[in-house]
């Protein structure tokens, strides 16, 4: 038996394949197959349909009833069901509706997928008969137009090498398509269309309404939140204004209190300054200006005055008279006054503090007792006061007349300043001493 070997000239076959198919890239993977006594190049990649098939499918797509026929072709050729994304571009150019409902596409895909499992005798039928039958058939309603989106994926899988097989179609499949159309028409209830599609549209409209309501609710919630935030901002502004007003009122109160305090302090300082000026005027030969020095001078001046008064008190006879007045039993006819008692107590205290001086000391050394004319005048006044006190107490001593007293007072400064003999002053001062002794003798 002779074996026939095919000619391995790939140029002719490649030329034929390039005429049937589009231009193939150089790096494409190709498989060698034996068909009808010839070697055929078959690519392992997904095949693109030829231009003729696309034009034929575009013509059939304009008639919605051809979807069932194209689906029947896919039943006969299940190997070419895979399709690239680029093959569906021509089918997208004729969308039936502006908005494709996903519920209808899912329903149609499930519904027509059950047609693939139908089986039966096949009878060839020409394309002219199918076209006439499609012209007589009623066009599907608009709600089923989404089924067309399912058809291109199956129709686009036909290869260019099997174009001659598309001229014949089984009659049984066309009859089944008629039955399916009748079922769809009867289930739709006349010209009202498919109730499921209408329900889907109603559900879509209901979902759109609910979405609108949700949007309105969200917008209302946003407006409420914005209004609440505005209210919160206004409340915070009011609080800040209230805090500022309270701070201002507190600051004004503090400033007023400070002003009042300053005024009172100024008045007090003015009073102190006035009193210090008066005290400075009382102190002789005071040239100090500060308060501390003025007060020191005033204290020293008061101490000196106190010492002078003590010396004058001890040198005069007022101490003995006060001591005698302290005992009320000496003078039963005279009531003791509180002023006299106070003087007697002071004299006793002073006598206890200071030792009793000899009365001859002023006679021998008159300069120790009276060192200046002012002290001499004070001593003369003390003598006059002692005489008045003695008269008040009831004992009236014999005193020289007032003219003689003035003479003695005038002579004492002259004698002391002139450093004369002490006889004159002793004779002049002996008279008051004798009167005092006589007075004490009478009392005893």
From Swiss-Prot:
Induction: Down-regulated by brassinolids (BL), but up-regulated by cold. Follows a free-running robust circadian rhythm, with higher levels during the light phase. Rapidly induced by light in etiolated plants. Up-regulated by white light. Rapid degradation after red light exposure (at protein level). Accumulates to high levels in the dark, is selectively degraded in response to red light and remains at high levels under shade-mimicking conditions. Mainly expressed in leaves and seedlings, and, to a lower extent, in stems, fruits, flowers and roots. Residues 26-39 are annotated as: Involved in interaction with phyB. Residues 175-185, 256-265 have a biased composition (Basic and acidic residues). InterPro entries: bHLH_dom, HLH_DNA-bd_sf, PIF1-like_bHLH, PIF3-like. Residues 154-265, 416-444 are annotated as: Disordered. Residues 155-171, 224-244, 424-437 have a biased composition (Polar residues). Changing residue 32 to A: Loss of binding to PHYB. SUPFAM superfamilies: HLH, helix-loop-helix DNA-binding domain. Residues 256-305 form the bHLH domain. Homodimer. Interacts specifically with the Pfr form of phytochrome B and with TOC1/APRR1. May form a heterodimer with PIF3. Interacts with PHYB, CRY1 and CRY2 in the nucleus in response to low blue light (LBL). Interacts with TOPP4. Associates to PTAC12/HMR/PAP5 which acts as a transcriptional coactivator. The active phytochrome binding (APB) motif (26-39) is involved in interaction with PHYB and is required for proteasome-mediated degradation. This is Transcription factor PIF5. The lineage of its organism: Eukaryota, Viridiplantae, Streptophyta, Embryophyta, Tracheophyta. The gene is PIF5.
């Amino acid at each position: 038996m002779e074996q026939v070997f095919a000619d391995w000239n790939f140029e002719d076959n490649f030329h034929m394949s390039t005429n049937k198919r589009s231009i193939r890239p150089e790096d494409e993977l190709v498989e060698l197959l034996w068909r009808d006594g010839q070697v055929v190049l078959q690519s392992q990649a997904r095949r693109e349909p030829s231009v003729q098939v696309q034009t034929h499918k575009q013509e059939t797509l304009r008639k919605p009833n051809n979807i069932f026929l194209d689906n029947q072709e896919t039943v006969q050729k299940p190997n070419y069901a895979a399709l690239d994304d680029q093959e569906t571009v021509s089918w997208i150019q004729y969308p039936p509706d502006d908005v494709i409902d996903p519920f209808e596409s899912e329903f149609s895909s499930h519904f027509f997928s059950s047609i693939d499992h139908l089986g039966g005798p096949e009878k060839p039928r020409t394309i002219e008969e199918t076209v006439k039958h499609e012209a007589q058939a009623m066009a599907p309603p608009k709600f089923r137009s989404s089924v067309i989106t399912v058809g291109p994926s199956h129709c686009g899988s036909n290869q260019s090498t099997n174009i001659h097989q598309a001229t014949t179609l089984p009659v049984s499949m066309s009859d089944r398509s008629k039955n399916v159309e009748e079922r769809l028409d009867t289930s739709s209830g006349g010209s009202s269309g498919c109730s499921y599609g209408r329900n889907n549209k109603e559900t879509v409209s209901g979902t759109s309404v609910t979405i609108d309501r949700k949007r309105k609710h969200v917008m209302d919630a946003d407006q409420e939140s914005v209004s609440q935030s505005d209210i919160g901002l206004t409340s915070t502004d009011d609080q800040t204004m209230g805090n500022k007003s309270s701070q201002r009122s507190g600051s004004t109160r503090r400033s007023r209190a400070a002003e009042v305090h300053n005024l009172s302090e100024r008045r007090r300082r003015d009073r102190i300054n006035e009193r210090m000026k008066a005290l400075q005027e009382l102190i002789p030969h005071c040239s100090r200006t500060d308060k501390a020095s003025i007060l020191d001078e005033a204290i020293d001046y008061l101490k000196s005055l106190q010492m002078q008064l003590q010396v004058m008190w001890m040198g005069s006879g007022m101490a003995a008279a006060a001591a005698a007045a302290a005992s009320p039993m000496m003078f039963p006819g005279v009531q003791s006054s509180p002023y006299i008692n106070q003087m007697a107590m002071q004299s006793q205290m002073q006598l206890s503090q200071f030792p009793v001086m000899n009365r001859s000391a002023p006679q021998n050394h008159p300069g120790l007792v009276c060192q200046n004319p002012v002290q001499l005048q004070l001593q003369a006044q003390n003598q006059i006061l002692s005489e008045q006190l003695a008269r008040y107490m009831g004992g009236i001593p014999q005193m020289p007349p007032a003219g003689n007293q003035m003479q003695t007072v005038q002579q004492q400064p002259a004698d002391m300043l002139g450093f004369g003999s002490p006889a004159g002053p002793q004779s002049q001062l002996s008279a008051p001493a004798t009167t005092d002794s006589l007075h004490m003798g009478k009392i005893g």
